[in-house]
């Protein structure tokens, strides 16, 4: 609504303090009833996500490739964060990095000296060339819905 100017007096989004407050209050109010509170690095960026690790957040989500939902909504923070960058960011916040399964069970805890590279760490600078681009994908007519009445395809 903000980006397209559809509604008057709509803010471009929450302030940084709004974001911190929301996560901190969620941690206090939920009182570990929901044990994992995640920061969306795609929406908030790496620096804000790192700060949120000190304000109730204990999960940074994962490495997303060709993510489209946040990108379509205007997120500006990238399509890929390499695992080694995640671990460095977590350590710099004074936390211990761990990898989890989708079910939130811990898969692996990384120690201070772990410098293991993940295959995604080895992807070059041309991330869109390797994985594709959401912005290019949505411009292709190939995947657009065409109502059967207007379609030239034979059914």
Regions found by a protein language model. Give the residues of each.
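Auxiliary Fe-S-binding modules of radical SAM enzymes
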Residues: 1-155
């Amino acid at each position: 609504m903000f980006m397209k100017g559809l509604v008057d007096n709509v803010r471009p989004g929450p302030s940084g303090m709004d974001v911190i407050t929301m996560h901190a209050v969620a941690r206090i109010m939920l009182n570990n009833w929901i044990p994992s509170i995640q920061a969306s690095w795609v929406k908030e960026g790496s620096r804000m996500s790192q700060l949120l690790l000190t304000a109730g957040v204990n999960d940074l989500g994962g490495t997303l490739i060709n993510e489209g939902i946040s990108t379509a909504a205007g997120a500006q923070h990238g399509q890929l964060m390499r695992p080694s960058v995640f671990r460095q960011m977590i350590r710099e916040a004074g936390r211990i990095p761990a990898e989890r399964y989708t079910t939130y069970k811990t898969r692996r805890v990384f120690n201070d000296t772990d410098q293991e590279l993940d295959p995604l760490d080895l992807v070059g600078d041309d991330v869109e060339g390797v994985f594709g681009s959401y912005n290019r994908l949505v411009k292709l007519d190939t995947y657009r819905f065409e109502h059967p009445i207007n379609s030239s395809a034979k059914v």
